[in-house]
C-alpha cells in the first residue's frame, strides 16, 4: 500500500492507495509545530479507525508547500513506517516541461495537479485549485507547463473582510438565496461567492485568449464544487486530483521504473 501526503498551508490531506485505487483518505489541520511523534499518533489513530496497520504501507510520497513541517514528517515516516519517503521536488520524474522563468519556484502542489490532470483528462488544460491561495495553471498541447496565476483564496479574503471591517461578521461561505442581498450576511455571501465566480471566469477567459486555445478547465480543492455550480467555465471537478498526482509521480520514480 502507498501512503500519499499533501501538505497545504491550511490543511494536510492524506490517502492510502492499494493496487492503484484510493481506498482511504483523511484531512487534518496543518500544524507547523507538531513533532514526528505527534504526527505518528495522529496517523496511528486514523489507521486504527480504518482497520489499517503501519506494516501494510510499503511506500510514502509527500508534497508540501510548508517547508518547516517537512523535517518532522520525514522523521515520522522513518520512525513509524521505517520508510524513506519520496519528496516532490526538483529532480523527480514528472513528465512535465516547466516553462517558468525559474522552474524551482513552481509549488509542489501545482506540479502534482498538472501531472494528474494531463494523465486523466488530456491537454491543453487549465487547472484551478481552490486552496489557501487560488492557483491557475496552464498546460499547453505539448504537455508544457506554461505558467499561471495566483490569487488570494476565498477563505483568506473572507477572513480579511471580517478582520478589517469592524461591523462585518464572520460568515459561512455558502450560496445566498439572492444575488441582491437583503441583509449584511447575505450581501457578504453574495459578494464573496459571485465575486470569485467572476474572478475564475475572467482569468480563464483571458488565459484562453492569450493561448489562442480552448483547453479543458479542471477544478479541485474544497470549494471547487461551490464555484463550479455557479459557472459554466469549469468542465470537471476532481476533489482528489492532488492525491492522484502523487500516486502517479510515485510510480514514475520507484526504484526500477523506466
Swiss-Prot record:
Give a GO cellular-component term: cytoplasm
According to UniProt, this protein's pathway is: Cofactor biosynthesis; coenzyme A biosynthesis; CoA from (R)-pantothenate: step 1/5
> InterPro entries of this UniProt entry?
ATPase_NBD (IPR043129), Type_III_PanK (IPR004619)
**Keyword field:** ATP-binding, Coenzyme A biosynthesis, Cytoplasm, Kinase, Metal-binding, Nucleotide-binding, Potassium, Transferase
Q: GO MF terms on file?
A: ATP binding; metal ion binding; pantothenate kinase activity
Q: Which residues bind substrate?
A: 100, 107-110, 184
Location in the cell? Cytoplasm
Q: Which positions carry the signal peptide feature in this UniProt record? A: none
Q: Which cofactor does it need?
A: NH4(+); K(+)
Q: Which reaction does it catalyse?
A: (R)-pantothenate + ATP = (R)-4'-phosphopantothenate + ADP + H(+)
Q: Which residues bind K(+)?
A: 129
Provide the top EC class: transferase
Alphabetically, which GO biological process terms does the record hold?
coenzyme A biosynthetic process
Assembly with partners or alone:
Homodimer.
Known role: Catalyzes the phosphorylation of pantothenate (Pan), the first step in CoA biosynthesis. Cannot utilize a phosphoryl donor other than ATP.
HAMAP family, A to Z: Pantothen_kinase_3 (MF_01274)
- Similarity field: Belongs to the type III pantothenate kinase family.
Protein name per the record: Type III pantothenate kinase
Q: Which organism is it from?
A: Bacillus subtilis (strain 168)
Amino acid at each position: 500500500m502507498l501512503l500519499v501526503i499533501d501538505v497545504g498551508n491550511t490543511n494536510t490531506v492524506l490517502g492510502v492507495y492499494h493496487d492503484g485505487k484510493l481506498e482511504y483518505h483523511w484531512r487534518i489541520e496543518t500544524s507547523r509545530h507538531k513533532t514526528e511523534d505527534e504526527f505518528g499518533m495522529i496517523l496511528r489513530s486514523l489507521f486504527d479507525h480504518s482497520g489499517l496497520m503501519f506494516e501494510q504501507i510499503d511506500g510514502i510520497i509527500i508534497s508540501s508547500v510548508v517547508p518547516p513541517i517537512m523535517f518532522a514528517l520525514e522523521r515520522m515516516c522513518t520512525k513509524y513506517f521505517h520508510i524513506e519517503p519520496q519528496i516532490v521536488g526538483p529532480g523527480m520524474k514528472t513528465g512535465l516541461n516547466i516553462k517558468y522563468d525559474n522552474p524551482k519556484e513552481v509549488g509542489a502542489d501545482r506540479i502534482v495537479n498538472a501531472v494528474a490532470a494531463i494523465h486523466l483528462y488530456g491537454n491543453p488544460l487549465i487547472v484551478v485549485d481552490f486552496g489557501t491561495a487560488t492557483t491557475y495553471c496552464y498546460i499547453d498541447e505539448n504537455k508544457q507547463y506554461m505558467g499561471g496565476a495566483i490569487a488570494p483564496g476565498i477563505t483568506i479574503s473572507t477572513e480579511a473582510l471580517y478582520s478589517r471591517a469592524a461591523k462585518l461578521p464572520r460568515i459561512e461561505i455558502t450560496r445566498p438565496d439572492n444575488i441582491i442581498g437583503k441583509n449584511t450576511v447575505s450581501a457578504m455571501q453574495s459578494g464573496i461567492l459571485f465575486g470569485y465566480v467572476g474572478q475564475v471566469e475572467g482569468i480563464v477567459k483571458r488565459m484562453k485568449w492569450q493561448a489562442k486555445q480552448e483547453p479543458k478547465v479542471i477544478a479541485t480543492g474544497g470549494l471547487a464544487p461551490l464555484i463550479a455550480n455557479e459557472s459554466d467555465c469549469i468542465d470537471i471537478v476532481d476533489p482528489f486530483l492532488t492525491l492522484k498526482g502523487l500516486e502517479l509521480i510515485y510510480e514514475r520514480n520507484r526504484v526500477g521504473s523506466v
